[in-house]
UniProtKB/Swiss-Prot annotation:
Residues 60-64 are annotated as: G2. This is Elongation factor Tu. CDD domains: EF_Tu (cd01884), EFTU_II (cd03697), EFTU_III (cd03707). Coiled coil: none annotated. The lineage of its organism: Bacteria, Pseudomonadati, Pseudomonadota, Gammaproteobacteria, Candidatus Palibaumannia. InterPro entries: EF-Tu_GTP-bd, EF-Tu_GTPase, EFTu-like_2, EFTU_2, G_TR_CS, P-loop_NTPase, Small_GTP-bd, T_Tr_GTP-bd_dom. Its main location: cytoplasm. Mg(2+) binds at T26.
Length: 394
């Protein structure tokens, strides 16, 4: 029991492996758990324990993902690994597994391949802030010039997608040899662990960000006024502070005159808590589900944005047929649906179920949004896609 307690004192970081099929992402994941379990305690997992990933649902989409955990000298890591390319696309777009940093696995025998590029692009689009490179299968390449070449190609590719290619840490190793406890190669896993600790900074916690609460319900309490309820997404709201009500209608400003949780009055509501907020001088009809309460000036309402979207296939309960420009589904942000129209890239005539695609969306009503906000695409309450805001246009 004491060990559990000890782990909680360590800083917690979320990471994952990305990269081309068969370049050794899962083998590396297994090697990390094996080598670090020996060095710092924890459980070693075999390749097949990680490879048959359980299904999970995120925003109505089924994704196969393996979650493993391990300790380094200074930190505790939660690590995601996906068996298939489509699972990565879905995972990154839905944000099912948010990553503070990613380990890009590139086989020395192949160099960068199409999915290497696609995963780097996705990491850029969905806001994965840091990438570390592990060049795998180095035991199979005798020519050091070839390794140099692979390294140069990877750095160029990272720079192309606005990651700092020149300064990205690159480790050369062999996951398979490390799993066989070959000391020359286990040392590379330890090196990777040290780089994870030093290169990925401590992420900013939700509680330190500006206050935001997506409104789920609105009540009027006679003699007290209007109460909105919801789960605080980020930040802290103290009684007496000003807040803005943003989205759907024109933005208005009011003051929080009370915070309650489980029918008890509090001085403040914090990230992660389900609270009721009493608002001064606000009528029941002025507020609705789908709006947000936010720190004044911290977030703005928008109607037009660029996005990266995954469209469910038929087996996932999605559409059976493609759609074309002029498609008008609902876009579900936080707690509500808003109808919108889409613009497809010039060279795209139609979008098939199972595709991932960039699209520009025009909403009929404004929603409080920042880059990185995730949404579902729905038709009559049924989820047909998932997306992330990559750029705000207006």
């Amino acid at each position: 029991m004491s060990k559990e307690k000890f782990q909680r004192t360590k800083l917690h970081i979320n990471v994952g492996t990305i990269g081309h099929v068969d370049h050794g992402k899962t083998t590396l994941t297994a090697a990390i758990t094996a080598v670090l379990a020996k060095a710092y305690g924890g459980n070693a997992l075999a390749f097949d324990q990680i490879d048959n990933a359980p299904e999970e649902k995120a925003r109505g989409i089924t994704i196969n993902t393996s979650h493993v955990e391990y300790d380094t000298k200074n930190r505790h890591y939660a690590h995601v690994d996906c068996p298939g390319h489509a699972d990565y696309v879905k995972n990154m777009i839905t944000g099912a597994a948010q990553m503070d940093g990613a380990i890009l696995v590139v086989a020395a025998t192949d160099g960068p391949m199409p999915q290497t590029r696609e995963h780097i692009l996705l990491a850029r689009q969905v806001g994965v802030p840091y990438i570390i490179v592990f060049i795998n299968k180095c035991d199979m390449v005798d020519d050091s010039e070839l390794l140099e070449l692979v390294e140069i190609e990877v750095r160029e590719l990272l720079s192309q997608y606005e990651f700092p290619g020149e300064n990205t840490p690159i480790i050369r190793g062999s996951a398979l040899k490390a799993l066989e406890h070959d000391v020359d190669w286990t040392s590379k896993i330890i090196e990777l662990a040290e780089v994870l600790d030093s290169y990925i900074p401590e992420p900013k916690r939700a509680i330190d960000k500006p206050f935001l609460l997506p409104i789920e319900d609105v009540f009027s309490i006679s003699g007290r006024g209007t109460v909105v309820t919801g789960r605080v997404e980020r930040g802290i709201l103290k009684v007496g502070e000003e807040v803005e009500i943003i989205g759907i209608k024109n933005t208005t400003k009011t003051t929080c005159t009370g915070v309650e949780m489980f029918r008890k009055l509090l001085d403040e509501g914090r990230a992660g808590e389900n609270i009721g907020v009493l608002l001064r001088g606000v009528k029941r009809d002025d507020v609705e589900r789908g709006q947000v309460l936010a720190k004044p000036g911290s977030i703005k309402p928008h109607t037009k944005f660029a996005s990266e979207v995954y469209i469910l296939n038929k087996d996932e309960g999605g559409r059976h047929t493609p759609f074309f420009k002029g498609y008008r589904p609902q876009f579900y942000f936080r707690t509500t649906d808003v109808t919108g129209t889409i613009e497809l890239p010039i060279d795209v005539e139609m979008v098939m179920p199972g595709d991932n695609i960039k699209m520009i969306v025009n909403l009929i009503a404004p929603i409080a949004m920042d880059q990185g906000l995730r949404f579902a695409i729905r038709e009559g309450g049924r989820t047909v896609g998932a997306g992330i805001v990559t750029d705000i246009i207006e």
